Amino acid sequence: MQAFTFHEGLVAPLDRENVDTDLIIPKQFLKSIKRTGFGPNLFDELRYLDHGEPGMDNSKRPLNPDFVLNQPRYQGASILLGRKNFGCGSSREHAPWALQQYGFRAIIAPSYADIFFNNSFKNGLLPIVLTELEVARLFDEVKAFPGYKLKVDLERQVVIAADGREMAFEVDAFRKYCLLNGFDDIGLTLRQSDKIRAFEAERLARHPWLESRPVA
C-alpha cells in the first residue's frame, strides 16, 4: 500500500455525526468482486439526487449541489473533516477503499467506530483523533476560508493548521511503522519470506509424511 509520512491537502468538512458505513458506500455497491472502482460512489446517497446502482454512468447522474464534495471550493480535497462516531454501522472494508479511491489520505474526527478505525490503518488511510474542541475550531476555519489546507506529519504525530498551530494526535507504534513504510498485512508477511521458506524446508525434512502425495 502507499506509504504515509507527511501530507498537505485541501480539507473538506462533512458536518454530521454518526456517519455510517452504508452512507460512505451503500450496500448495493458491495457486490463487486474487485477492490477498485468505489470512489465514484463514495457518499452516493448524499452526492447524487437519484438512486445509484452498480454499472450506472455517474457522469450522467444529477449531482446534489448542496453536498460538500460537489461544491467547487472543495474539489480536490484530500483530508476529510468529520464529527464523532465516524464510520459506525456494519463492518465493510469497502468504506476506507471508497474514501481512499476518491482521493482522501487522512480523516480527522473526535472518534471513530472501532472496525472502521482498524480497517483504515490496514488500507493506508490515516484516521486522526483530535478533541471535539479542536475539530470544532477546524470546522469554523475551513468554512470561513476557501482553499483551507492542513498539514499532517505522521513522524511527529501532529496536524499543523493554516496559522501554524500544532495539534498532537496519538497513534499505535506498530500502525505508525506500517503506514510510514507502506506495509499492509501481505507486505509484512512477505518480509518474512526467507524465514517461511526455511521453516517449510525444515518441516518437510522432519515430517515428510505431512506432505500430500498423488495417489498412484
From Swiss-Prot:
GO molecular function term, any single one? 3-isopropylmalate dehydratase activity
| Gene3D superfamilies according to UniProt | Aconitase, domain 4
Q: Which reaction does it catalyse?
A: (2R,3S)-3-isopropylmalate = (2S)-2-isopropylmalate
Q: In which pathway does it act?
A: Amino-acid biosynthesis; L-leucine biosynthesis; L-leucine from 3-methyl-2-oxobutanoate: step 2/4
GO CC terms in record: 3-isopropylmalate dehydratase complex
Q: Which SUPFAM superfamilies does the record associate with it?
A: LeuD/IlvD-like
The top EC class, named as a word, is lyase
Alphabetized CDD domains for the sequence: IPMI_Swivel
Write the record's keywords in alphabetical order, separated by commas. Amino-acid biosynthesis, Branched-chain amino acid biosynthesis, Leucine biosynthesis, Lyase
The GO biological-process annotations, alphabetized, read as: L-leucine biosynthetic process
InterPro entries for the chain: 3-IsopropMal_deHydase_ssu, Aconitase/3IPM_dehydase_swvl, AconitaseA/IPMdHydase_ssu_swvl, IPMI_Swivel, LeuD
Q: What is its EC number?
A: 4.2.1.33
Q: Which Pfam families match?
A: Aconitase_C
Top-rank taxon, per record: Bacteria
Summarizing the function annotation, the protein's role is: Catalyzes the isomerization between 2-isopropylmalate and 3-isopropylmalate, via the formation of 2-isopropylmaleate.
Identify its protein family: Belongs to the LeuD family. LeuD type 1 subfamily.
PANTHER family reported in the protein's UniProt record: 3-ISOPROPYLMALATE DEHYDRATASE SMALL SUBUNIT (PTHR43345:SF5), 3-ISOPROPYLMALATE DEHYDRATASE SMALL SUBUNIT 2-RELATED-RELATED (PTHR43345)
Quote the subunit structure annotation: Heterodimer of LeuC and LeuD.
State the protein's name.
3-isopropylmalate dehydratase small subunit
| Name of the gene this protein is made from | leuD
